[in-house]
Amino acid sequence: MTERVDPKKLIKGGLHDWEVVIGMEIHAQVTSRSKLFSGASTEFGGEPNDHVSLVDAAMPGMLPVINEECVAQAVRTGLGLKAQINLRSVFDRKNYFYPDLPQGYQISQYKDPIVGEGEVLVDLPEGESITVGIERLHLEQDAGKSLHDQDPTKSFVDLNRSGVALMEIVSRPDLRSSEEARAYVTKLRTILRYLGTCDGDMEKGSLRADVNVSVRRPGEPLGTRCEIKNVNSIRFIGQAIETEARRQIAILEDGGKIDQETRLYDPGKGETRSMRSKEEAHDYRYFPDPDLLPLEFDQAYVDALASGLPELPDAKKARFIKDFGLSAYDAGVLVAERASADYFEAVARGRDGKAAANWVINELFGRLNKEGRSIEDTPVSAEQLGTIVDLIGDGVISGKIAKDLFEIVWSEGGDPRAIVEARGMKQVTDTGAIEAAVDAIIAANPDKVEQAKAKPTLLGWFVGQTMKATGGKANPAAVNALLKDKLGIE
């Protein structure tokens, strides 16, 4: 691809400007009821070693059997990434020793992965976007978990996670800033959640990132990269990249060289520290797993899975812009979570799309964020919010009263129309009543009347006073028209 250098994204060192080059390896836990090669449960949060089969524990004579649902989920993900689906792939043994890896090797895919090259379109602030290349996606087993805080002199191993299916999604080194990296992971997580192939819960370890970072002077060859392992939040991904890039720049500007190694990010200390020298592929002694035949399926299998895919974020965003007249920004906010997009569509159906988006984004999302709640936990249903939008559009209530009504529905529930009737919240459309209020305000403020003729912006003050006098129930358009006429403002 053509190299791009964005001056805004260069990092200023003590001597030079530097470009950071980032590639990502995302480990996404496959959404399935059982593990990749055994029937043990993948449920999170069980007692230690409660979800372990003889295969997971690597007991002698136990053979792996592929879980077809995990294969289907990997293919769906590949299709969602616009990637090449390989009809033949091979499982390999990746040999290394860890206490929580009972086999002494991990079953993974090396030369022949299930998914080949693809791409992800990533939206950035200020209307920019970049395309990040996907190098490959392969299936592999997760390892268990070592526990070091249970006893002062012993470590324990929990194999509940051992053998759980992971998709390792490897990007090309197309990212050039921590902001781009965060946006990429956010978009990838959104796609996975839409597809239903990974829940993307980083707190539970369902999505983990290995971040490859190198720096170079603009236009120069790629520098030596360091891999930061198992970063478990999008915020920490950004911090780890910034910290590691600064570390490398300081070494290079001091005349040193970067050692290729695996590092760990410590958010408490705000630093990366060395874990081990970075392994190369030959260190793992990959070879095809003799217990597993090559994985083969036909194009009809892929086509059947493709026909069942949901509408993905990019397509949904384009449709929202086209069908509802939304801005790219508003459409992007609404499609960021599938549940949010579904909620908006339910509100907007048969209504003014822009008005619906305004209420969903500004009022509903604003309140949800304030209270730390998710869209799934909203006390205001799409039907209730749609009714509020209808009441405004039909002129039954004003925008100000609508906000009061929203608060009532949020706190107490109920049918918005019935609440408006019961509490006398309908806006005043009787021009006689509005005119009486306007006349009273004009009569009480002769000095303001004179000022308004010279300074038309004072109209807003008169509108505010009229709305106050009518308890916010006066029709704003009628108030504006009457005041302009009586004050002689064009």
Swiss-Prot record:
Pfam hit, one: GatB_Yqey
EC category: ligase
Catalytic reaction equation(s): L-glutamyl-tRNA(Gln) + L-glutamine + ATP + H2O = L-glutaminyl-tRNA(Gln) + L-glutamate + ADP + phosphate + H(+); L-aspartyl-tRNA(Asn) + L-glutamine + ATP + H2O = L-asparaginyl-tRNA(Asn) + L-glutamate + ADP + phosphate + 2 H(+)
E.C. no: 6.3.5.-
InterPro entries: Asn/Gln-tRNA_amidoTrfase_suB/E, Asn/Gln-tRNA_Trfase_suB/E_cat, Asn/Gln_amidotransferase, Asn/Gln_tRNA_amidoTrase-B-like, GatB, GatB_C_1, GatB_Yqey_C_2, Gln-tRNA_amidoTrfase_suB_CS
GO molecular function: asparaginyl-tRNA synthase (glutamine-hydrolyzing) activity; ATP binding; glutaminyl-tRNA synthase (glutamine-hydrolyzing) activity
Record GO biological process: glutaminyl-tRNAGln biosynthesis via transamidation; translation
Keywords assigned: ATP-binding, Ligase, Nucleotide-binding, Protein biosynthesis
Signal sequence extent: none
Alphabetized PANTHER family for the sequence: GLUTAMYL-TRNA GLN AMIDOTRANSFERASE SUBUNIT B MITOCHONDRIAL AND PROKARYOTIC PET112-RELATED, GLUTAMYL-TRNA(GLN) AMIDOTRANSFERASE SUBUNIT B, MITOCHONDRIAL
Protein family membership: Belongs to the GatB/GatE family. GatB subfamily.
Subunit structure: Heterotrimer of A, B and C subunits.
Function: Allows the formation of correctly charged Asn-tRNA(Asn) or Gln-tRNA(Gln) through the transamidation of misacylated Asp-tRNA(Asn) or Glu-tRNA(Gln) in organisms which lack either or both of asparaginyl-tRNA or glutaminyl-tRNA synthetases. The reaction takes place in the presence of glutamine and ATP through an activated phospho-Asp-tRNA(Asn) or phospho-Glu-tRNA(Gln).
Record protein name field: Aspartyl/glutamyl-tRNA(Asn/Gln) amidotransferase subunit B
Organism: Methylorubrum extorquens (strain CM4 / NCIMB 13688) (Methylobacterium extorquens)
